């Protein structure tokens, strides 16, 4: 707890300016989240934000128990950090967070980790039209990821290049050039847009390997004098820790360059990568560095979703409510939380590190009109954030940032109703039911992104930079500034 005018108060998930302006906001915590309930002594705040009691009584649904002005001001820390952990929920905006909270933790509950971040705001996510150079109001993951990773707006589909096709350096590349350790973790294929934007520069996001690159990104192909496919550039970028899916692309064969005629798996081995294919093998890794970087690939494509499908249908809202269940296909797949913890353990060092972590299938389940798959991957996101926060609280020199890359289609609507779209009704933690609508397509698998601004929240040194309305390009600048990086260093 923090004392304000003689009263104990909790902090808010919001922010204030350093000088005189306090900006009201809201945050939460969890009594059983492993982060403790005695208060965050590193930041001088108690990140706890659940309903006060019986939500049917006056004041029972309150998440605040006093004036927050001083508590918020006290949560602002120094502006330099040794480490930055950027956690992305792909396709995760406020509707997706609310759906997960309502289902898994209850309407008056809290999302562990995510709702515990003391400072927050929203950022704009628009892309650019490749031809007109004017705003494209609904972004994809390639353009959005390029924005935060390089500080440059671009067209949908572009990975690490501007609207004219010119390569833009990423935070990971700059951090590595400045002597920091680097990591890239995802639940998707490592070649997918969000992980790719930190390590590659191609005209089209589907240029995973040499085969696709020659077909879709001709000038980027090694055979045509370009930098190569996303996977080839990933290997050349040489992050200290790289964990995710996408093994099938590593079976493609290079068609030019030093490794011509060899598979990308063989290339990785010859470049000195430690390759692991299971959680058990990952547990055995003790070090990862530039002499022996770690490449963990745990699925042929995307990692399986934690929870089984419950696809929405035309009449799903009227059908009996569904309770989500574990996905049998997940099996022994490493969870995002364990991948995050392992990456942090391998990256922590005296000089500092930059780590990007993505829960990528919130988006993919949203495209599929699959609320249970979507919520399960938001639970994975929550667990990863809790792990990052636990480290940051102990380290006291780590900035944790959590955001989505774009808004998506899922909506909570009137319970039991149907729409012109696809719906599904779920049983919730509260013992009630809610109905989810997917209204941008009648075909599961074809649901579309939407163009709303997206929440961004943070904890640690420099966290106040997320406050208010910012743009998706802003994180590139304040992350590199907080880390004290020379953006011109090669």
Regions found by a protein language model. Name each.
Residues 3-15:
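Bacterial N-terminal signal peptides that target proteins for export
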Residues 24-27:
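C-terminal motif of bacterial Sec signal peptides marking the signal peptidase cleavage site
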Residues 29-32:
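Bacterial signal peptide processing site
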Residues 34-80:
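N-terminal low-complexity, Pro/Thr/Ser-rich intrinsically disordered segments
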Residues 53-63, 76-82, 92-97, 102-139, ...:
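A post-motif C-terminal structural segment
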Residues 83-91, 176:
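N-terminal amphipathic, basic-rich helices that act as targeting or association modules
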Residues 154-165:
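His/Cys-centered metal/cofactor-coordination and adjacent catalytic loops
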Residues 172-173, 177-197:
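Glycine-rich phosphate/pyrophosphate-binding loops
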């Amino acid at each position: 707890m923090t004392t304000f005018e003689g009263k104990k108060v909790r902090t808010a998930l919001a922010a204030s300016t350093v000088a005189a302006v306090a900006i009201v906001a809201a945050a939460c915590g969890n009594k059983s989240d492993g982060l403790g309930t005695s208060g965050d002594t590193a930041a001088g705040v108690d990140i706890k934000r659940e309903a006060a009691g019986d939500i049917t009584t006056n004041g029972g649904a309150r998440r605040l128990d006093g004036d927050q002005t001083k508590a918020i001001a006290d949560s602002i820390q120094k502006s330099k950090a040794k480490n930055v952990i950027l956690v992305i929920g792909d396709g995760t905006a406020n509707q997706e967070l609310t759906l997960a909270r309502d289902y898994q933790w209850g309407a008056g509950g809290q999302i562990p980790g995510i709702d515990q971040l003391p400072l927050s705001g929203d950022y704009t996510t628009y892309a650019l039209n490749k031809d007109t150079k004017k705003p494209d109001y609904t972004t994809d993951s390639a353009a959005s990821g390029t924005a935060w990773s390089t500080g440059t707006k671009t067209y949908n589909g572009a990975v690490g290049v501007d609207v004219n096709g010119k390569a833009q350096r990423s935070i990971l590349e700059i951090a590595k050039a400045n002597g920091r350790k680097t990591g890239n973790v995802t639940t998707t294929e490592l070649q997918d847009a969000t992980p790719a934007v930190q390590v590659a520069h191609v005209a089209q996001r589907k240029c995973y390997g040499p085969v696709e690159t020659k077909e879709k990104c001709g000038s980027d192909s090694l055979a045509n004098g370009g930098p190569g496919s996303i996977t080839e550039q990933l290997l050349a970028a040489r992050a200290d820790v790289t964990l995710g899916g996408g093994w099938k692309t590593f079976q493609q064969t290079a068609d030019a360059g030093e490794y011509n005629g060899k598979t990308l798996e063989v290339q990785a081995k010859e470049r000195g990568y430690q390759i692991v294919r299971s959680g058990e093998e990952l547990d055995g890794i003790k070090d990862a560095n530039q002499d022996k970087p770690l490449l963990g690939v745990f699925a042929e494509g995307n990692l399986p979703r934690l929870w089984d499908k419950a696809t929405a249908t035309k009449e799903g809202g009227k059908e009996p409510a569904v309770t989500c269940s574990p996905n049998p296909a997940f099996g022994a797949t490493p969870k995002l939380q364990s991948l995050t913890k392992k990456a942090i353990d391998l990256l922590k060092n005296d000089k500092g590190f930059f780590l990007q972590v993505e829960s990528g299938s919130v988006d993919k389940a949203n495209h599929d009109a699959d609320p249970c798959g979507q919520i399960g991957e938001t639970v994975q996101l929550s667990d990863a954030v809790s792990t990052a926060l636990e480290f940051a609280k102990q380290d006291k020199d780590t900035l944790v940032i959590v955001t989505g890359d774009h808004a998506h289609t899922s909506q909570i609507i009137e319970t039991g109703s149907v729409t012109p779209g696809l719906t599904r009704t779920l049983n919730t933690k509260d013992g009630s039911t809610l109905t989810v609508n997917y209204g941008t397509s009648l075909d599961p698998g074809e649901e579309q992104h939407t163009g709303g601004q997206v929440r961004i929240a943070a904890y640690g040194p420099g966290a106040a930079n997320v406050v208010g309305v910012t743009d998706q390009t802003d994180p590139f600048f304040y992350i590199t500034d907080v880390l004290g990086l020379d953006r011109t260093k090669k």
